[in-house]
Every structure is written in C-alpha cells, then in structure tokens.
Swiss-Prot record:
The species this protein was found in: Trichodesmium erythraeum (strain IMS101)
SMART domains: NDK
Keyword ATP-binding attached: yes
Name of the gene: ndk
HAMAP family per record: NDP_kinase
Name of this chain's protein: Nucleoside diphosphate kinase
Length: 149
C-alpha cells in the first residue's frame, strides 16, 4: 500500500491546528501508521531539506523547522501521495485554493504549516529519514472496505 510522509511544522503546532489537519486525512479515508511529536535536530533538518541547501533561504528554513515542536506522520492509502498534495494545497498559502489546508489556514510562504512528500520515491526516502521501521504500525481499519473496492 502506498505511503506518504506528512509533517505539521512548528507554526501549525503552535497555532493549535494539529487535530484539524489530522482530521483532513482521516476523513479522506487514509490510515495513520506513524505519528510522533518532536523537536527537530539541525542534522535532521539539513538532511530533510538538502535539496534547498544552495538556496538563499536555507539557513532560515532550518532555524524555523527547529524553532518548536513538529508533528511527523506517515499516512497510508491508495493514491495517498498525490491526494495528500491536493489536501495540503499550493506551497504559497496566498495562491492555495480555499478548502485546502494552506488555503484555509496558511498566511505566508515562510509559515505554510505543513510538509507533504511530492512523489512516491521521495515519500519513501523521507519516511526512512524520520521513522524507524518499528515506529510504523500496519493495520487495516474496518471502514476500508467502504472506501476502496
């Protein structure tokens, strides 16, 4: 079954949006298989955002992601990577569609609440970076048969 990595960034945690964000994925029918609240080390932040290391905003991004608690999650379900991206919305909250997490709750590009893997391959890399295998729990909700044929 397809999996994706989702992180509620420190601004989402500080604003009390964790429950509402999790609810978006649950009501869509995805299964939460990994969840932890944590403070992010500089090493982990730099590995996660390695793709941006040459960008001018890299150091401020690292400082921001370390600035407070973050909720790291792994969600499972059919088409979860692409669907999660739609649920999250455009990177810039000012251009994100209403009805998306960023469109409804986001205020600025630098504080866009949430991260979601952008591809199946990226999801696997990010899951392996943020979670140990024993931290993930595979299970099948009884409602799955009502969601997926």
């Amino acid at each position: 079954m397809e999996r994706t990595f989702i992180a509620i960034k420190p601004d989402g945690v500080q604003r009390g949006l964790v429950g509402q964000i999790i609810s978006r994925f649950e009501t869509k029918g995805f299964t939460l298989v990994g969840l932890k609240i944590m403070t992010v080390t500089k090493e982990l932040a730099e590995k996660h955002y390695d793709v941006h290391k040459e960008r001018p905003f890299f150091s401020s991004l690292i400082e921001f992601i370390k600035s407070g608690p973050l909720v790291a999650m792994v969600w499972e379900g059919e088409g979860v990577v692409a669907s999660a991206r739609k649920i999250i919305g455009a990177t810039n909250p000012l251009t994100a569609e209403p009805g998306t997490i960023r469109g409804d709750y986001g205020i600025s590009l630098g504080r866009n609440l949430i991260h979601g893997s952008d591809a199946i391959e990226t999801a696997q890399t990010e899951i392996n970076l943020w979670f140990k295998e024993e931290e993930l729990v595979s299970w099948k909700p009884t409602l799955t048969s009502w969601i997926v044929e």
